[in-house]
Amino acid sequence: MRRPSTLRIALLSGSLAVLSVAGFAVSQMLPLPAHPSSAVTPQGLLSKSFDDSAPNAAQVRRGQYLVAAGDCISCHLREGGEAFAGGLALNTPFGLIYTSNITPDRDTGIGAWSSDQFFRAMHDGKGAHGEDLYPAFPYPWFRRVSREDDDAIFAFLMTLPAVNYTPPKNDLAFPLNFRTLVGAWNTLFLDSHNFQSDPEQSAEWNRGAYLVNGLGHCGACHTPKNSLGADKSKQELQGGKLDNWVAPDLTSNTRIGLGDWSVDDIAEFLASGRNAHAAAGGAMADVISYSTSFISDADRRAIAVYLKSQPASPSVAASSPDAGAMRRGAEIYSDACASCHLDNGVGQSRLFPPLGKDAMLQQPDPTGLEHLILGGTRIGVSASRPSPLGMPSFAWKLTDQEIADVSTYIRNSWGNQAAPVAVADVSELRKKLNLQTVRLTDNSGDH
């Protein structure tokens, strides 16, 4: 249940992806429902109180908490739609998959489902009538969730307002539009093992492992995939790519992962979307807003403890940047970036993040930085950080060459070291994002 995107056979966008963002300058509002029936906000549904007199109040409250931990809203909320009603288009390499309606509407949602059918969907990827569900629904991770927790999630979903809405039909390339092929995918790649605690580890570590590898489904985004959308062997949490964003490495690699982050740093990031190292944008903004800001301090810390125990990914050698690109990039940075991030790249703590030794900026694949500069982003909001700040798009102002140069400069300044950015890659991404081109190229004034 996460906001995804370009995942292979469409594995969902990772719930606990740590996406570091380079800056924020303008306020942006979260999309609001288009219909009066949606007066209850997604955050309101996640914080709603339940009467203790109800026979299953404790189970429903637990389900409400687990739905937040699984970040269900981020995927099952389309722009302008009602929470949990689905209809969000997941842009996968194989076509579009639309998320389902999981409100208790009997005709278009899951109101006619039994708890057994719901468990089978979560555990085996099977629909109400036994049909195979596409792995855009991350059952490869949810199958590790206990039956007790699945039943609690189902109990909470049954308390939601029923929304009569049918999402559009999927638009997948032949032959992937035949669900029978998913069965073959499951045979090849689906891990049949349920979650097992490690007796050699602490209770806190095991709780973190349960969340990261189960409801949190972090690997859906942060583990690289093969051509069929399955996890690459022995590369858990070493970074992935989806919907023209990069989900960074979450291992202990000190340059491109979480090696320089403490347990407290990770927990703070999950609570507020900001810490001394980074701020959450892209798909991670929704994870903060609808998921990790709602879970307990203890669970955020458990996740952090587990992530800090992951072995570092292999080091990646970076080629030296061209001196001309660095010189041009420095000039562009001074004009377009330094007002927020300062000339020395230190930014302003927990407002405009520092750019030096930034893991996301040094990822082997620079698509995330290119996307950030071209399209801008918003930061996730939370109770502790309610201001909906964002970084504006520079597509209107900077040419592809200028974006390549300033990206190369940022990726190789203040202790950073990463491969140069190719102008052809920026041009290709601009086309994919359908962003305007710049009319002038001197970068000396209004365009």
What is each PLM-predicted segment?
Residues R2-A39:
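N-terminal type II signal-anchor transmembrane helix
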Residues L32-F50, L77-I97, A128-A209, N213-G214, ...:
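Flexible coil segments in periplasmic/lumen-exposed cytochrome c-class electron-transfer proteins
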Residues L45-I73:
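Short extracytoplasmic
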Residues T108-K126, G130, G259-V263:
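Aromatic- and charge-enriched surface segment that lines or borders ligand/interaction sites
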Residues D124-G127, S272-A276, G375:
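Glycine-rich, acidic and aromatic/proline-enriched surface loops and short helix-turn segments
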Residues L270, S291, G356-D405:
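Extended, polar beta-sheet/loop recognition surfaces of beta-rich domains
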Residues A330-H371, S387:
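C-terminal structural cap/anchor segments
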